[in-house]
Design a protein with these regions (language model features):
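Generic structural signal for secondary-structure transition and capping sites
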Residues: 45-46, 94, 205
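C-terminal boundary/linker of central alpha/beta nucleotide-binding cores
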Residues: 1-70, 80-83
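Alpha-solenoid helical repeat architecture
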Residues: 94-96, 107-109, 145-150, 181-192, ...
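Short, polar/flexible loop-turn hinges at active-site or ligand-entry regions and domain interfaces
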Residues: 17, 71-76, 180-181
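Tandem amphipathic alpha-helical repeat scaffolds
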Residues: 113-121, 148-163, 189-206, 228-245
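Heptad-repeat amphipathic alpha-helical coiled-coil interaction surface used
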Residues: 86, 98-99, 111, 153, ...
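Amphipathic alpha-helical segments of tetratricopeptide repeats
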Residues: 42, 99, 119-120, 135-140, ...
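Extended alpha-helical scaffolding segments used for macromolecular assembly and cargo binding
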Residues: 73-160, 165-168
Length: 245
């Protein structure tokens, strides 16, 4: 914990429901939890510093257990606290923690949105295995109606060497796309789905299907997605050369 996070959790927030069902916390008053934490730290009471700057702390184990027991007496407060923590962590760039708190609050739609947001950076840094651990905590019904999340899952399972599981998610992505409104974020998906299938075919040693899906990906991937188009061209060339032998 840190001062700003404690301010966010201790503030009397109003979680406002809007017509589309989203929930956002209103701005909290300017509490001074940082001063309180500093005083407790100086007195060596209840908390332990986690960094040299003494910005982050944890509770002493026994005190944490006591607070946890007290909080469990009010389940609604537990959910509300997790939701507030999720919003705070997201606003401050801690998306992994934001996801964990959203799941703890059982706000699975919010958790799914966070998983979609963080996937590109986790894929770029070879963390798709960790990302798959995230979405395995989400209900299947939440995943399969989200074409972006399904496509990301298809790619991640392909990276993990599970082409059959990948294909199931790619099929769910196509079904979700068929019933979805036309949105800019959906435009790259058909090409990405085709490219993922090319990788799955390559993993199975299916050269003809690799060429077919890689060529389809070249047709579908937007012109400005230079990286994905280059992947499709490379796969087409490599598979065609293998086929010609």
């Amino acid at each position: 914990m840190c001062g700003p996070l404690c301010d966010a959790l201790l503030a009397i927030w109003k979680i406002e429901g809007v017509e589309d069902g989203s929930r956002e916390p209103s701005n909290p008053p300017d509490l001074q939890a940082s001063d309180l934490l500093s005083n407790l730290d100086s007195a060596n009471l209840f908390i332990v510093p986690l960094d040299n700057d003494r910005q982050w702390y944890r509770y002493h184990r026994l005190f944490a257990d006591l607070l946890r027991q007290r909080l469990q007496q009010s389940p609604a407060d537990v959910t509300d606290s997790h939701l507030r923590a999720s919003h705070w962590h997201q606003a401050n760039g801690y998306l992994a923690e934001a996801f964990q708190h959203a799941v703890a609050a059982k706000d699975f739609e919010r958790a799914a949105e966070l998983a979609e947001q963080v996937w590109p950076s986790m894929e770029d840094t070879f963390q798709t295995t960790a990302w798959l651990g995230w979405i395995k905590r989400l209900p299947t019904d939440v995943i399969r109606v989200r074409p972006v999340l399904c496509t990301q899952a298809g790619w991640s399972f392909s990276d993990a060497g599970e082409p059959e599981t990948s294909e199931r998610h790619l099929q769910n992505a196509e079904r979700a796309l068929a019933g979805a409104a036309d949105r800019a974020e959906f435009k790259p998906l058909p090409g990405n789905i085709a490219l993922a299938r090319a990788y799955n075919a390559q993993a199975r040693g299916q050269v003809a299907d690799t060429v077919k899906y890689a060529e389809l990906a070249q047709q579908l991937i937007p012109e400005d997605d230079v990286y994905r188009r280059a992947q499709a061209v490379s796969m087409t060339t490599s598979a065609a050369a293998t086929k010609a032998r």
